[in-house]
Structure formats: C-alpha cells, structure tokens
Amino acid sequence: VLGLAPGANIGKEAAIFEAVHGSAPDIAGRKIANPCALLLAAAQMLTHLDMADRAERLRKAIAETISAGDRTTPDLGGTGNTDQFADAIIERL
C-alpha cells in the first residue's frame, strides 16, 4: 500500500526523512493520498532529534486514526480524503 512506509537516510552530518513509495498519477489531484508515510517520517525525524515523546504521540495518533477507520483514505478502506485524514490525526494529538 502506498503511503505507509517512512524512510530515513542518516549520515554523520545530515539526515533526510521521507515517504518511501513511488508516484501515484492515478490519484493526482483527487485529494485521496494517504499522508501516513510522510507523518511517520516526521516521527522518525523527531526521534532522531531526541524528541521521542513527541514522536510517540504522533505515532499513537496515526494508529488511533487508522483503527477508528472513519476518516481514513480509500487505500485503507475509508471514505475520507487527505485533509480529513490529516485533520483526524491532528485532533488526536
């Protein structure tokens, strides 16, 4: 499933955090992209920056939102759009 895998490239002097997936031209402009991979990459970044407590809060909010299922994107079986999914995660923070 696109949109679930975070990625990190960590070197001695720099670190880059990103979503790990290809493009999805079939959903371009439809506002149904799953934001989880990018948010999970942000959680990895927070951990890297010694903010593990904040990273855990974000991961928990994402997991709770997926479990609730009411505003997830169609790729996760929901009927929500990207904004609704992200808003639901923010509300749980």
List where the protein language model places each region.
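Glycine-rich phosphate/nucleotide-binding loop
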Residues: 1-57, 61-70
